[in-house]
């Protein structure tokens, strides 16, 4: 059951921002860079994806939305300019624009407006519109309560392998598409079942070397732990199922 205070709160995720990628063969350009198959990105089906290092470590994670022939990137507001700069390095002489655009990302845990979050249906609904209304105050607690991590603070930047971020289980990677930055090591880990560590949410404790983020107000922390030593980590159904099944 969704908490009434969350249901009645605002919907605008003020810590998110949008980038518009447009121009010649935009999907082909992003297909060779990102972890997600661009053919899966439609107006009704946004997709979670990432830009990785060549070694397969997460640099930026975001949600991709179709906008006609263009693609909108729903990313951390604090990382928008850095992400634009990074993507622009790969543009070379392509007739492609990568620009910040106005607009807000909105969320509700249980309204029929928008589309289900591509990572996990239980996260709720997400949609894009003008930056209007009150801020969504319950998003972080709702997300972490489901064991889902996101953003540079929690995932790290050039620190955590993408599959250690539970990308396979939460739909953030395609193993059927062609090459992209970081694909070789990511695919090798998947097919050899070599994902030995996982980012997990746990009750707040003494921070250590493996701690990525702490939220004293929520009594929670995010840590990278070995799968045989998850300890008191929250174990949502999706993670339990993932650890019980061999990779396909």
What does each of the following model-derived ranges do?
Residues 1-248:
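Basic, glycine/lysine-rich polyanion-binding surfaces/domains
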